[in-house]
From Swiss-Prot:
Keyword Membrane appears in the UniProt entry: yes
Major localisation: membrane
Record's protein name: CASP-like protein 1
Self-association state and partner proteins as the record states: Homodimer and heterodimers.
Gene Ontology CC terms: plasma membrane
UniProt keyword annotation of Lipid biosynthesis present: no
Amino acid sequence: MKTEARDGGSEWRWVAIFELFLRLAAIVSTSVAVYAAMGKIFVVAVNGVACFYLLMSLPVSIFNIMRPHAYPANRVFLNIMDMVMVALVTAGALAAGIVYLVEKAGNARASWVSVWSQFDSSSCFAVLALILHVLLSGVILYKQALNIKFKKLDSVD
């Protein structure tokens, strides 16, 4: 009976290892987005919070690799917090996207002219790259949050 319970543990361990890999990828992506967005306060703050959360959740992910069945509440808590971070990072990406569109095209009703016509095209592409990095980190966080498998654990009689 104990060998059957241990077989499920190896599957959970692979899920936890994949989750750790996704956390590291999200840390890299949010760090790049924070570095690229130094002028945009909201985007920097949101990605900084997400990066800090990901760094703080690494020990819990490593613990879940070593002991997959020890505390199932850890996985639930991480899943909920991952979804909160997805919402924050997505909000930052949307805010940066709106600023990008207004700066690029202007707004005729508000009598705003295009800002990008006064600068070279490289700064325009830098902001576009920032938005893509933020969206990429949001997608990685979303995939990480959906990675958790909820399955019924076999009870040992």
